[in-house]
Structures are given as C-alpha cells and as structure tokens.
C-alpha cells in the first residue's frame, strides 16, 4: 500500500494504547535522563546550606559516573520505533552525550564549587570518563568539561592552596 493509505484513517484506540504509554510520572525505563535527574537532585540536596553533606554528594557522583560509563558505550542517535513487521514507524530525538554531561554535572559543579571534596570527585569522574569512553567526540566533550571545571575552581572562594588541591583528582572524594 501507499504510505498515505497506511497512515490515513481512524486510529484503533486499543492499538494506540498498546503502543504508547501514558502516565502521570516519568520512569527510568522510558526516560533515561530521569535517572540522572534523581541522582543529581540527591547531590544538590546534600550540598544545600541546610544539609551541608558533601560526602553524600560524592556518593551521588559515584553513581552518576557509573551511569555515564554505561551510557558511553551506547549509540545516542535518534530513537527508532518499529511495528510488529519491523517497519520503521517513529523517529524521536534523543539527548546527545553533551546533554547528559550538562545534566549530570552542571548544577553539582555550580553548587559544589566551594567544596574541595566535591570538586576533586567531579574531576576524578571526568578523568575516568576520558579513559572509559572510546568515541573521540565524547572524549573531547569531557575534556572541554574538565576545562569548565578548572574555570569554576578559579572563580571559587577557595584559598590558593585549596584551589591547587581541587585541581587534583580524588576517586574517593576525601578532599584532603
């Protein structure tokens, strides 16, 4: 049949509801950015002045790094939806690698800029990603983000000694 004929006509509600999920909440299975958002929110709450718990923020960064390492092994081009006959029916945009880096680290970098512990763990996560991601474009994005982290340290209220320490990666985020 012609494409126009196949795409015209009434929509079977039963088939539509079987193909598309409707709900009031985002899920990790349907929206990969949601997983990052949850963990980033944990880190941000830990970094808030009322809580002031950089260790919890570091633990959140551990999880974010793990998510990014796993994601780095996957193709992040457009998403494709096929019908039961393997006919392409839907193409939908997916976040790019840089979008995930921004989501994962921007707010933590901003709100954790004055914590040597947090900055060192962020640096370690980024260096770890440059070693685990194989795509040159993605490695370049991580290296650009490392430069952004250096600029953040330069503008922070940390003392010169603390800034020097913050430029050294620390996998455990001890801040020493």
Q: What are these language model-derived features?
A:
Residues 3-176:
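Short basic (Lys/Arg) and small-residue
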